[in-house]
Amino acid sequence: MCIRDRFYDIANQVKPKADQHIDWNRSHLHIASAYTPEAVQYAKDYFKNGIDFLLDDGPHTLDSMIDCVKLYAPLMNQGGVLMIEDVQSKDWFQQLSAVAPSGVLFEAIDLTASGRYDDLIAVYQF
């Protein structure tokens, strides 16, 4: 097997399948490193009325997850939800809970009964 066979061609394989399920009149896809000041400023400028839902599927490191909460919590709308998937250890929930802004409900979701180690999700309800 050639190494290139292990990579997806986003434009020709993934996007056409996504197009079948996504209403692009109501959805926007932005691909970038979310953990830079430029990305946060872009999000702030683009989502002038705030963010209702944010899903972090980043590098899967504890530091990046904490950064996500610290960087994007100020942009979240009241009633909004910020989810971080693929939390790598149940032990991380304590630190992820500790960075929840005041008044924000934190929920640790453990779906590891499915047999997959990475089915841990941190949810912040604003």
Report each predicted region and the residues it spans.
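Conserved SAM/SAH-binding beta-strand->alpha-helix loop
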Residues: A11
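Alpha-helix C-terminal capping segments
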Residues: Q20-D23, F47, L96-A100
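Short, conserved SAM-binding/catalytic segment
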Residues: V14-S27
